[in-house]
């Protein structure tokens, strides 16, 4: 990736894409070291330094805890880029391009390998970079060095020593040799290789308890283990061992060429062998002590040898001066001083710690480390050196100061401690809350709808132009292989009201640019009320995504003027497959506390072995237990949270809840479901009103009565309402009484008058359902109240011969009457109807034997045709009207309808 592409990527971090971003007051890290915010990803195995000869091919390996979106490697020349003590120079790392014949980069899931051909122009420092969406995690530096062996100066030393038998002799053969890596040594006596009694002596040959058999000429040879190069040292030592008879008593003393003191440097964790040179007659004995190191001799790691002291697993506190006393009873004794320096790789004791920071604020990041030699600190901001950032300044104590935090600083900040033994790094998430950019006022005409962006000349009538404040860019968290969770917020403002939100996303690929996709769901804004001074926060999930793809997201806000405005896009998010992710700690719901009628409090905990550093916050899901719909969601920021209040619930309702933890990369499994309920509504208590005298009236209280208190009304208002109700009751009673008195007279006067409306009410139209839901015959009766209508009916029958369909609008079913007859009239009507029925039957019987002629009075046929299969008459054809002509009925039958019944249609 080119530096320009990297810069554009960093510039895309306009907000913290890792956390919710309300505006917070600046906070400072706690005085005691605490876990720094972690992105959930880290370098598991950093590349290691290699020493190799020219022409060799070496492999650097880098492994991350999660599979990154991509790996890259950077390089800079060495040793020009760093001093001999390992301090960092000013040269910059450059990104490498694979396939130029000198190097090759391969990737296998979360492991990247860099193959380098060792050449003079490839010697230097390498480090790998893992891209996790907006996060850039950089490994420590690995050094590629050339294997070499050289001799300091060409001064030859030929020593001749004469010693009494039983003494120990120390010969330093390799002090003039410099080798990278450390050389292996071979020793020869009279040209024959011998095996040294003590190994790892760094070119020092130590002969113990010499005898005449030890006499001879000694030489040595150095071999480079990496290149195999061998250097034969021209120096030599001739040893002569005296016989025991001719030796005289001598105090302990040094031989020619032996040092009076030594300086030993060793790496922590190695095995240290201290040798005490000196001979005497009789053979002296060595006694060890140290004025600087407590219990240097008497501990489990120390073993006293003949003229030697061995310390295993050397620690930093073993540094100091060691004194060897040689004593054989002849004065004076010999003192030999050895200064031991234990080198310790750098260790970061106080990692950086960053909190959510507003754009433009000043921030100081602290980092402290120990090591021998003292390590040098340097900083990387999303993989870029702080030296190249104009807003960054590194103080003499190693602290980093950002004078004005910018959006480009959002991401992963790493502190590196370095000395010649190696490097160590520690990092923290730096989250930047950007300044809200007020949008320019836009006028929308009457035709402006959703997505309208037409610009018009502003018309100012003395009012402030309305503004559309966009939502913040969404923070993205993985939920599953095919879904993510988005979190955004709207800062507190006095702009246009937002009606709802839409989520848009786009897949990023190397080919053709993909279009933005819009989800179908409308995310409601809710009540136009700010939850806090910080604004309102929202969450939404996006499903049907593809794993191992890179996406960008943005939020579209629709305002009350039917216009819309998009948020800034999120940083690139690489959707990891679940198999490649480190599992997140799963919270355990402990209790659902009934807090109020509309709120509950969730209480949870984490397992004792859970890594809290991986957690950024929690998602709470809840819904009524009687519902099978989607869950409502709430976001809980902070890994240390153990309780959370959920409000705006319904009273006396049982809900089910579940939790999951999340980080910038993934989310945990859901906790077990747990049910809880809100409190029942409190029963209101009513206080009986008390009558107070004028003197007892309280004139100092002006508070409004509470919701559970009864307000007493004034006596005048109470009397007015009571009197009106009583008057209304009297009027209704009088009206009902008058109606009942007039009813008998009216009934007697109107019982002999035509009651066409009442008769019509007794019949229902054909084709409709019978009120009593029973099968009835298809019988319709036409009652003519006018005696002269018989002739008109005959003329009508001639116009409509039998078989011709007639209008069915006037056809009715007869139903049970719903009014009460006068008893006398009921008896009279019943007898008249029976006579009429017998007359009709005789007339029908007389005509049944002959030809029907013009009359279709076949009653049996009509009855059969009128049989219905159900309560509703649904005949496919309209029934014809059957007219039966007969002589005039008796006078009694006239009372049937208070008139003449001239024709009956059946």
Curated annotation (Swiss-Prot):
Residues 470-578, 586-681 form the Fibronectin type-III domain. SUPFAM superfamilies: Fibronectin type III, Immunoglobulin. Residues 39-144, 134-236, 252-341, 346-433 form the Ig-like C2-type domain. Glycans are attached at residues 85, 104, 148, 209, 339, 388, 475, 568. One of its GO terms (biological process) is smoothened signaling pathway. It comes from the Eukaryota. Residues 854-866, 890-906 have a biased composition (Low complexity). SMART domains: FN3 (SM00060), IG (SM00409), IGc2 (SM00408). Residues 427-439, 676-689, 701-713 have a biased composition (Polar residues). The keyword Glycosyltransferase does not apply. Homodimer. Heterotetramer; 2 iHog chains bind 2 hh chains when facilitated by heparin, heparin is required to promote high-affinity interactions between hh and iHog. PANTHER family: BROTHER OF IHOG, ISOFORM G-RELATED, PROTEIN SIDEKICK. This is Interference hedgehog. It comes from Drosophila persimilis (Fruit fly).
